[in-house]
Amino acid sequence: MLKLEQVKKQYKNFTLDCSLEVRPGCITGLIGQNGAGKSTTFKAALGLIHTDGGTIEMLGKPERELKESDRQQLGVVLSDAGFSEYLQVKDVIAVMKSMYPNFEKDCFISRCEQFQIPLDKKIKEFSTGMKAKLKVLLALSHDAKFLIMDVK
């Protein structure tokens, strides 16, 4: 599912040098102090930042060769990313339907009800916990084959 070999990223006061493998069916957690490189590792794996060396494979392909259809198989939660907080969940549903052919609208709405996430309230009015729940529900809403979750 995910393989990083000697992935390097150099910042002014930090150097990431990471190798790891996540096999199908496995749950793997990265645990470390603030600034240890957990978020950097996730962003590198997703191709969101340029790395300074090493190789990254996801879903059996080099990360750079992933197509849109491959990326639609990923469910991603990043602590510093999400939808505009001026949107309502019902607006997010429309976006998800247009981006993910496998988006399961009815299941998503049912889960929102189960976890008390209102569809007609702006995200900026949500508590921190409600925002976190929404991100996870969105990551699970389109039958993703691989989940990457970077939460605080």
Predicted regions and their residues:
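ABC-family P-loop ATPase nucleotide-binding domains
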Residues: 78-135
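Catalytic Walker B motif of ABC-type/P-loop ATPase nucleotide-binding domains
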Residues: 147-151
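Helix-to-loop junction immediately C-terminal to a conserved catalytic motif
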Residues: 46
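Conserved ABC transporter NBD signature motif
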Residues: 54-65, 69-70
